[in-house]
Each structure stands twice: as C-alpha cells, then as structure tokens.
From Swiss-Prot:
This is Transcriptional regulator MraZ. InterPro entries: MraZ (IPR003444), MraZ_C (IPR035644), MraZ_dom (IPR020603), MraZ_N (IPR035642), MraZ_sf (IPR038619), SpoVT-AbrB_dom (IPR007159), SpoVT-AbrB_sf (IPR037914). It comes from Mycoplasmopsis pulmonis (strain UAB CTIP). Keywords: Cytoplasm, DNA-binding, Repeat, Transcription, Transcription regulation. Residues 6-48, 77-120 form the SpoVT-AbrB domain. Belongs to the MraZ family. The gene is mraZ.
Length: 147
C-alpha cells in the first residue's frame, strides 16, 4: 500500500468528509478511524487495522502503560463505512478529540492516512523549517533509523 500526498477538504453540514480518489481505492469502503497521538485522526483500511490491533495481543499485560495504551487505542477507534461517493460521517467524539470543526487536511503516511484539523496542520507546517528537518533526521539516524 502506498498512501502519499496531502489534500485539503471541508466537512459538509452533516459532518461527512469526502475521500480523495487516490485514498478511496486503498482504504476501501470500510475503514477505521483512531485518535491517539498528537490529536490527529489515523485512518486505516481493515488489513492495516488488524495488523495494528495484533500488536496489542503481544504486549505484556503486566505492563500498565501497555494496558492503558491498548484501552485508549480501542476506545478511541471506530469503524466507518463510506457511501458510493466516498463520503463518511466523522463521529462527534472523533471531531472533538481531533479539534476538527470544518476544514481538514488528509495526509498520506504510507500505510495509513492522517486526518488533521486545518488549523493544527498549518501550525505544524509553520513550525518546520529546513534546519528542524535536518535535526529530526539526525536524531532518527542516531537512534538507528535508516533513510
């Protein structure tokens, strides 16, 4: 799966969002929305969701952090179904957790799509410059991540 690029969209009055054609094919008509890190909605197709959910089955149940994270992951995940036009309803609790009001940005992240409130996305983009990108890349390389 190769999800990439970013697309700006707006919710309609019924809190429906239309997926870009590029993402519709990869995500299918049923997919999962999760809000955990950075207040960003992660959208996964069924296969990727099952892969992610499987990781929790292998966690140490004696580790409180692992239990808490698993609870949050499953509590903050919802399955949605897109209509024939590729629109789906964003549930109220997802909108609230992600601070989404109307305008959003969908960002392809390889195996998933991130859904940002436009205001939060713009703020993130404004905080990034070439020097920060180099620093991030250097720190990742130091921790063993290869590019």
């Amino acid at each position: 799966m190769a999800l990439y690029g970013n697309f700006e969209r707006s919710l309609d009055p019924k809190n429906r969002l239309s997926l870009p054609a590029k993402f519709k094919t990869e995500l299918g008509s049923n997919f999962y929305l999760s809000v955990l890190l950075d207040g960003v909605v992660e959208i996964r197709n069924s296969e990727e969701f099952e892969n992610e959910a499987h990781k929790f089955k292998t966690m140490n149940v004696l580790d409180k952090n692992a239990r808490d994270f698993a609870r949050l992951f499953f509590q903050r995940t919802v399955e949605v179904e897109a209509d024939k036009q590729g629109r789906f309803v964003l549930p109220k609790h997802i909108l609230e957790k992600a601070s989404i009001q109307k305008d959003v940005v969908l960002v392809g992240m390889g195996d998933k799509v991130e859904l940002w409130s436009k205001a939060k996305y713009d703020s993130f983009q404004d905080s990034i410059d070439d020097e920060k990108i180099e620093n991030i890349a250097f720190k990742l390389k130091e921790s063993g991540v290869e590019f």
